[in-house]
Amino acid sequence: MARPVHPEFDKKKVVAENRRARFEYFIEETYEAGICLTGTEVKSLRFGEGSIAESYAEVKNGEVWLVNSNVPEFSHGNRFNHVPKRPRKLLLKERQIAKFTGAVERKGMTLVPLSIYFNSRGRAKVELALAKGKNAADKRTTIKERDWKREKARIMKDHG
């Protein structure tokens, strides 16, 4: 029988988020991927340190790697500390990797990490998106829509 989940750990705890990704790209599909980390990287992430703002994922030799993500060295670590900007392997099923390879090569899409979080079982996961880049006009449209939503909310708050 499965262990009951404590209510505090029932939801995911986000430790790093790529906020610009939703502005820079059209998000087509999202996936959850495991990530290979060393012990000091896990400890550093549990303290809420880490950044994926400039990172991306790429497929190499049938494996998916998270490139340019920054997990700072663990403050209480010793000589066994990790390298902060090393490429980290993402754990996905072969079928998903094949889909990513096809989409990136044929359709000109990009693999963008949206967030790193710990799931209810305490495992580090990466929310990965298959995305297509926006041009300047699309970005302006996004800004206009966002501003209109804010203005509409402000009007509704003031008048009713």
From Swiss-Prot:
Annotated Pfam families = SmpB
What is a single cellular component term in the Gene Ontology annotation?
cytosol
Q: What is its main location?
A: cytoplasm
Kindly state a single biological-process term from the GO annotations of this entry: trans-translation
- Name the residues that span the membrane: none
Instruction: For this UniProt record, give its keywords in alphabetical order, as a comma-separated list.
Output: Cytoplasm, RNA-binding
RNA-binding among keywords: yes
What InterPro entries does the annotation carry? SmpB, SsrA-bd_prot, SsrA-bd_prot_CS
Task: Answer whether the UniProt record assigns the keyword Cytoplasm to this protein.
Answer: yes
Could you tell me one molecular function GO term of this UniProt entry? RNA binding
Q: Where does this polypeptide localize?
A: Cytoplasm
Q: Which PANTHER family match?
A: SSRA-BINDING PROTEIN (PTHR30308:SF2), TMRNA-BINDING COMPONENT OF TRANS-TRANSLATION TAGGING COMPLEX (PTHR30308)
Q: What family is reported?
A: Belongs to the SmpB family.
Its function?
Required for rescue of stalled ribosomes mediated by trans-translation. Binds to transfer-messenger RNA (tmRNA), required for stable association of tmRNA with ribosomes. tmRNA and SmpB together mimic tRNA shape, replacing the anticodon stem-loop with SmpB. tmRNA is encoded by the ssrA gene; the 2 termini fold to resemble tRNA(Ala) and it encodes a 'tag peptide', a short internal open reading frame. During trans-translation Ala-aminoacylated tmRNA acts like a tRNA, entering the A-site of stalled ribosomes, displacing the stalled mRNA.
What protein does this entry describe? SsrA-binding protein
Please tell me the species this chain comes from: Novosphingobium aromaticivorans (strain ATCC 700278 / DSM 12444 / CCUG 56034 / CIP 105152 / NBRC 16084 / F199)
Gene (name only): smpB
